[in-house]
Amino acid sequence: MQATSVDRNIRFLVIELFWAAIASAAYSFAAAYVIRLGGSNFIVSLITSAAAVVNMVTTIPFAALMERTANRRPWLFRSLITFRLMHIGLIFVPFLPYWRAEAVVVILLLANIPVAIFNTVWLPMFADIIPIQRRARLFSARNVTLGATMMVATYGFGRWLESDANAFPGNYQILFCIALIMSMLSTWYVTRMDIPDSPIDPAAHVDRSLAGMWKLFTENKAYSSITINTLILNIAPWAAIALQPIYFVRVLHASDEWLGIWFAITNGGAILGNLFWPRLMEKYGFYRIMTIAAVISCTYFFAIGFVPNLTAILVFSLFIGMINPGIDIAHFNILLQVCSPQRRALALGIFVTVMNFGLMVSSLIVSPMIDLIGPQALVIGLGVLRLVGGLLFVVNPVVRSETHLMQTAE
């Protein structure tokens, strides 16, 4: 792409995320919303697992469709708008006489159908519109925007929700109205981006059967390694999505205001991390930095498990917020590079499906594991799994050298 188009896209990718971050900050209280609607631990875990089921079932068919579709822009825009409009249902849930917590799960379940379409276009799109030399800086800018905005918004929303707890559910309904408006502003900027047709080879015979997808997975050692390693690495944070609201609210008795502070501090740490990780990646390479950060990240789970104190957890959250960008920025760049341009849509579709399977299983086991060993022991166990996942990138390396990574798939 021309430099002017790249610059324009980078600008819009940062601006749209500002508005999307405000919406995300509001929706981050969805688990607390379900708990206050009377949802059980199992219902809270379904918020994550239901979305994972939909994405797991639909991503590969949509990715196969996108692999043979050069003009993916209409699919991108329409799926994004549909997804965001479907969140209107959250506003009206309190008017239901029964099954209100369950209704939230149903809404999020259905909303993830357009998300699956969106992701099959959005993820490979970055490789098409942003040169690899500029991706780390772009992802850093997006992450800083996301972190700074969510830090302020989550803290403000948490304080506001806590200021008049008796206003429930009206305060949450207003919160989701704000989220809807902000998400529409984000969508408008996405529609202004310059997105070229994706590379396809219409003359090539592509086997999209299960056997063909298995061959795609096994023939590329780097691709299969990053998929397996990432699956194990992410079990802990996936389970934590459902576990942390239960652990913080029901066990440690965290308030809405504390949750807002926690979200804000975690995102504040991400801002700091995004300021220094890209420079280290330019000096030492994506893979080395990702591996180091992945191993270090296990300390968060050990810390909040062995020190169940809400004030101390805020300090630990600042730390993990700083560490996570070192994993996320490097990992996405590596993943894009190990997938060939012509097969990138389907390869990423398979990757996302495997990850959603892990997300679903990780979320569903939270409730029975809490009943079996208790939330505190479960948090510590997740720390062990996170450590194992980080070490896999050492014993089962994705690439042998940074030079090989930069040459891959280009």
Language-model regions, residue ranges each:
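Helix-loop boundary and gating motifs at the non-cytosolic
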Residues: 1-57, 66, 77, 88, ...
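Juxtamembrane intracellular "pre-TM" segments in multi-pass secondary transporters
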Residues: 1-6, 196-228, 410
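Helix-to-loop junctions at the C-terminal end of transmembrane segments
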Residues: 58-71, 161, 273-285, 370-371
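Structural signature of the two symmetry-related core transmembrane helices
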Residues: 74-89, 288-303, 383
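Intracellular juxtamembrane helix-capping segments at the cytosolic ends
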Residues: 116-130, 326-339
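Helix-loop junctions on the cytosolic side of multi-pass membrane transporters
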Residues: 172, 187-204, 394-406
